[in-house]
């Protein structure tokens, strides 16, 4: 499932020739996650963004036997029993997981450009007078979301589907996950109901929806991948990258982008808060991080 970007998924597994694109700029990188975000020019003059992430290492004996058989070590230094090398692995183990956003717009470019980050404490009044008007003016297209919900795209990737129009959702892998290493599992639930932008819109009336996503989503993950519910973190982003309610499910050992403090809000915490105070998220000050050039940050300051 696509997360954070607009995309048209056709299910076509044919190779894409990159000769029609040329390098323009490195927007950002993440050395800890071995990721890079590259701005490209296309032959027709439109911009594109390539998100490149090195795949996690395999953990099975067969793969490592093949790696050891087909690899060479290029020496860097040696000191007593300790040696440093560059491991030159076979091509089949050196693929880079990538997502192409094409065509992209200035909002996408700003999203992936490295910037200073700041903490925002958003009061209910701030949300009504600053954040909500910004969302209404600047929401990126949700066509890719509706394509998934309407079975126009990514049908073959659906893990579980609840068809109820009010409390239903679709669970599918996020494009950040290669689908191979379970310790990097990343799937996402998209709610069927339109109009719920984020946790700010949730009330106790939405508890059946949220509990259904949690319970049915975790059961579906266990059935397909064999992972127990205690091995999965389920959370929302606030602010989310797109304003149609969705829930992230990741392996508890995986430090996914934006899964930490001041960005991720646990699904169980949201459920518990709404049970205690039915309109908790309309009354609370919510804390999140924003980039320096983010219009929400500029308006707040």
From Swiss-Prot:
Pfam families found in the cross-reference section: DcpS (PF05652), DcpS_C (PF11969)
Sequence motif: Histidine triad motif, positions: 244-248
One example GO MF annotation: 5'-(N(7)-methyl 5'-triphosphoguanosine)-[mRNA] diphosphatase activity
Activity regulation comment: The hydrolytic product 7-methylguanosine diphosphate (m7GDP) efficiently inhibits the decapping scavenger activity and acts as a competitive inhibitor in vitro.
Catalyzed reactions: a 5'-end (N(7)-methyl 5'-triphosphoguanosine)-ribonucleoside in mRNA + H2O = N(7)-methyl-GMP + a 5'-end diphospho-ribonucleoside in mRNA + 2 H(+); a 5'-end (N(2),N(2),N(7)-trimethyl 5'-triphosphoguanosine)-ribonucleoside in mRNA + H2O = (N(2),N(2),N(7))-trimethyl-GMP + a 5'-end diphospho-ribonucleoside in mRNA + 2 H(+)
Subcellular location: Nucleus
Entry-linked PANTHER family: HISTIDINE TRIAD HIT PROTEIN MEMBER, M7GPPPX DIPHOSPHATASE
Family membership noted in the UniProt record: Belongs to the HIT family.
Name of the protein: m7GpppX diphosphatase
């Amino acid at each position: 499932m696509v997360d954070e970007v607009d995309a048209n998924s056709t299910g076509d597994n044919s190779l894409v020739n990159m000769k029609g694109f040329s390098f323009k700029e490195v927007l950002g990188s993440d050395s800890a996650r071995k990721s890079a975000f590259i701005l490209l020019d296309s032959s027709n003059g439109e911009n594109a963004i390539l998100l490149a992430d090195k795949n996690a290492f395999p953990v099975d004996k067969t793969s490592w036997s093949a790696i050891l058989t087909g690899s060479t070590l290029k020496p860097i230094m040696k000191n007593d029993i300790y040696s440093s090398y560059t491991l030159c692995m076979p091509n089949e183990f050196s693929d880079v997981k990538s997502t192409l956003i094409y065509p992209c717009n200035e909002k996408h470019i700003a999203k992936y450009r490295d910037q200073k980050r700041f903490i925002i404490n958003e009061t209910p009044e701030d949300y009504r007078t600053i954040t909500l008007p910004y969302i209404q003016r600047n929401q990126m297209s949700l066509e890719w979301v509706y394509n998934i919900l309407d079975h126009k795209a990514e049908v073959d990737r659906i893990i579980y589907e609840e068809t109820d129009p009010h409390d239903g959702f679709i669970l599918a892998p996020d494009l950040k996950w290669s689908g191979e290493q379970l310790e990097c599992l990343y799937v996402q639930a998209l709610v069927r109901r339109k109009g719920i932008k984020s946790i700010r819109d949730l009330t106790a009336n939405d508890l059946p929806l949220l509990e259904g996503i949690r319970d049915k989503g975790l059961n579906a993950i266990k059935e397909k991948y064999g992972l127990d519910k205690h091995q999965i973190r389920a959370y929302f982003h606030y602010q989310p990258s797109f304003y149609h309610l969705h829930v992230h499910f990741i392996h508890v050992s995986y430090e996914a982008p934006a899964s930490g403090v001041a960005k991720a809000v646990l699904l169980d915490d949201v459920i518990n808060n709404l049970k205690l105070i039915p309109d908790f998220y309309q009354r609370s000050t919510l804390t999140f991080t924003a980039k320096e050039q983010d219009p929400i940050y500029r308006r707040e300051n």
